[in-house]
Every structure is written in structure tokens, then in C-alpha cells.
């Protein structure tokens, strides 16, 4: 059985009709700026097997980040179904119970770390256990230390984010994601804000997770990152155009399509 199946995911961003420039004049005459639509996902289908590290690769604007956000209900899809470890979720009509069920099985790793600046590495990892799960602090600290050991930062448990390098901060965010032991890790450009050496270290850590039973879905625009995954799924214009061997030439994004610098996609 596949760990994760995605069926017919669709998403269109809409801008509401708004008064045009010089609204005071045009609004009285009835002239308004027309609403616009941008179809970002066009019926995406894919399957991820348990324990795989899969890269979803594509240039800026291809829809890859929006797809990942829909899978974790950070965006609501217009249509689509997610089957995760045998459980089915309607990506267009989820209630709070559905979202809670899904998030018990997934963890999201962001490009920007999103650490609490006034808390230590250990406190960042254990915050959710103590507040959301009401776990006693002593027990939460023990679990948190195990996660920091797993990412090679046990000796930095008392450090604040400002005392950590970018790569170390990303490792803390991964430890925080792992603390609930989710079967699926969703990572959005986790190496995008790092230099190439540190990025390879973080990617190596994500690759190690599949040996511990985790399934990793990694979003990237970078061919050199994607090629290290077990498999590449390439998106262009909101559609899957390649799904297969990560070392095949046709899996790669053409250099002319790559952004000059890594950019965080707002609607892609």
C-alpha cells in the first residue's frame, strides 16, 4: 500500500474585483477592475511509497509549493483527494477533525525555520508537547533531547536561535517536526536559505529519516538537490510532466527556467 496518494488536486487563485485607479472617479461611473484567475494546480495525481524520499521539482510558479500547502491544509484546494496511510481526506472540504487527523500523521518543515527567538533549541522542540499535548516538562525534555540527538544537536540544546548557524536552526526545525514521530515529513525548500555545503548536510539528514521509517516529500527548484532523492516528480504549469528516476536527464528543470536566486513562492 502506498503511504501517500494524491488524486486530481486543483487550485485556482482569484483576485476579487476592485475599484480601478482613481477609485473615486471610476467608482461613480461604474468602472471596476475585472477579477482575475490563475489556475495553479491542474488535476495533479501522484503516489509516494512508504519510506521513499521524493523530490517535487519545478521552476518558480510551477505550483509545487501550493501543492504542498494543500496537502497540509495550509491552503484549501478547489478539488482533490489525499489518501494518507489508508485514510482518505477531501482537500476541498475538510473540517477541524480532518485537519487534526492529518496533522497527527504529517509534519511540515519550512524554509524559514520559524523558531521562537526567545526560546532555546530544546524549548523550541518541546513547546508543542508541553502546550498542545499537556506532557509534563521533564518527560517532554527527555523526548526533545532524543530528537536533538537524532539531528546532531544534543550539545546545542541550551543555545538560542541567534547562537546557531542557519543549518543548525534548520536542524532544530526538523527535530521539532520529528518530535511527534509523524510517518510523513513535508519539506518546503528546506535548503533554500542555506549555502550549498550546509544544504547538503540538511538534505543528508532528511535522507537518513527514511531509514527510520519516515516518508519524505521535498519541494525544490534546484536540480542538484532533487537528483539526490529516490524519485523526482516534476511540475510545470500546475501539471505533472515527469515522474520517475531522479537521474534521468528528462527529470531536470531546464536552466533557462530556473530563477536566478532561490525565491519563496507565495502562490506557486
Segments (PLM) and residue ranges:
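ABC family nucleotide-binding domain
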Residues: 2-235
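Conserved beta-strand-loop-alpha-helix hinge in the C-terminal portion
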Residues: 239-266
Amino acid at each position: 500500500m502506498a503511504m501517500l496518494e494524491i488524486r486530481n488536486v486543483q487550485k485556482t487563485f482569484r483576485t476579487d474585483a476592485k475599484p480601478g485607479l482613481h477609485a473615486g472617479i471610476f467608482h461613480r461611473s461604474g468602472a471596476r477592475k475585472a477579477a482575475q484567475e490563475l489556475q495553479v494546480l491542474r488535476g495533479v495525481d501522484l503516489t509516494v511509497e512508504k519510506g521513499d524520499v521524493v523530490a517535487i521539482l519545478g521552476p518558480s510558479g510551477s505550483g509545487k509549493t501550493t501543492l504542498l500547502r494543500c496537502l497540509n491544509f495550509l491552503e484549501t484546494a478547489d478539488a482533490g483527494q489525499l489518501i494518507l496511510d489508508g485514510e482518505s481526506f477531501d482537500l476541498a472540504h475538510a473540517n477541524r477533525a480532518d485537519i487534526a487527523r492529518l496533522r497527527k500523521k504529517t509534519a511540515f518543515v519550512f524554509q524559514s525555520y520559524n523558531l521562537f527567538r526567545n526560546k532555546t533549541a530544546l524549548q523550541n522542540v518541546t513547546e508543542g508537547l508541553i502546550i498542545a499535548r499537556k506532557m509534563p516538562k521533564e518527560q517532554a525534555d527527555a523526548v526533545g533531547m532524543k530528537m536533538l540527538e537524532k539531528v546532531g544537536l544534543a550539545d546545542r540544546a541550551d543555545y538560542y536561535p541567534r547562537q546557531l548557524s542557519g543549518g543548525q536552526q534548520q536542524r532544530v526545525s526538523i527535530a521539532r517536526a520529528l518530535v511527534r514521530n509523524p510517518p510523513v515529513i513535508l519539506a518546503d525548500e528546506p535548503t533554500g536559505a542555506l549555502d550549498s555545503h550546509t544544504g547538503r548536510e540538511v538534505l543528508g539528514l532528511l535522507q537518513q529519516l527514511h531509514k527510520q521509517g519516515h516518508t519524505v516529500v521535498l519541494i525544490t527548484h534546484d536540480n542538484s538537490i532533487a537528483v539526490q532523492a529516490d524519485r523526482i516528480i516534476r511540475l510545470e504549469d500546475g501539471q505533472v510532466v515527469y515522474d520517475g528516476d531522479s537521474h534521468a536527464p528528462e527529470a531536470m528543470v531546464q536552466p533557462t527556467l530556473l530563477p536566478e536566486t532561490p525565491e519563496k513562492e507565495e502562490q506557486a
